């Protein structure tokens, strides 16, 4: 299929139908990884023409994605990132962890959005946020596509830094997702402090299965994420 750049169609529709003036596009990365955080970016772009070649981060080469992310960070009106740690994913489950990361991103923006465009069909944000879900929004919607690229590049950088400490796991190449190198290191060495211990991959590793658990916080609170992965977000 020929390349079709994302547009401001959804943003314009929200402005016309809801009166929203400040609209944030939101996308996540790391949902299916075995290690590392889930990362969410919220980006406010307005209706300006985006940098050339903007699309879903998964459709871009690493080199192009990295260059484009730098362009986008300068081009967007504002953006912010939120993360949910492996511990929080284990304690809360993925849907709640996504919401936690998304709220952190949205609340870190300099202005509260009037509406949010969320990639996908499932609204994991909910009330009080005014949400419009868009399937493949990271390909069709400018603000969501921008959030997709920024989130992907930032999380990849974080995982590459973790890979320095745990070189055998190949985090710089696989970003915490399953790969032959990652699986071999898990079988030999077991999970790192950055692995999600409630996930099914441990069922296939009998020597490490005893580590599988879903953690819960005794007081019902969720700890702050800063510092939990070894560097400042």
UniProtKB/Swiss-Prot annotation:
One GO molecular function term of this record is: RNA binding
Q: Which residues form a coiled coil?
A: none
Cofactor-binding details, from the entry? Manganese or magnesium. Binds 1 divalent metal ion per monomer in the absence of substrate. May bind a second metal ion after substrate binding.
Could you tell me which InterPro entries the record lists for this protein? RNase_HII, RNase_HII/HIII, RNase_HII/HIII_dom, RNaseH-like_sf, RNaseH_sf
Into which EC class is this enzyme placed?
hydrolase
Domain RNase H type-2: residue ranges = 21-211
Q: What is its main location?
A: cytoplasm
Its required cofactor(s), as named, are: Mn(2+); Mg(2+)
Q: Which UniProt keywords apply?
A: Cytoplasm, Endonuclease, Hydrolase, Manganese, Metal-binding, Nuclease
UniProt catalytic activity: Endonucleolytic cleavage to 5'-phosphomonoester
Q: Which residues bind a divalent metal cation?
A: 27-28, 119
Determine the domain of life of the protein's source. Bacteria
Supply one GO CC term from the record: ribonuclease H2 complex
A Pfam family hit: RNase_HII
Described purpose of this protein according to its UniProt entry: Endonuclease that specifically degrades the RNA of RNA-DNA hybrids.
State the family named in the UniProt similarity comment for this chain. Belongs to the RNase HII family.
Write down the PANTHER family for this protein, in alphabetical order: RIBONUCLEASE H2 SUBUNIT A (PTHR10954), RIBONUCLEASE HII (PTHR10954:SF18)
HAMAP family (UniProt xref): RNase_HII_B
| Alphabetical list of NCBIfam families matching this protein | PRK00015.1-3
Q: Which named protein is this? A: Ribonuclease HII
What species was this sequence derived from? Streptomyces avermitilis (strain ATCC 31267 / DSM 46492 / JCM 5070 / NBRC 14893 / NCIMB 12804 / NRRL 8165 / MA-4680)
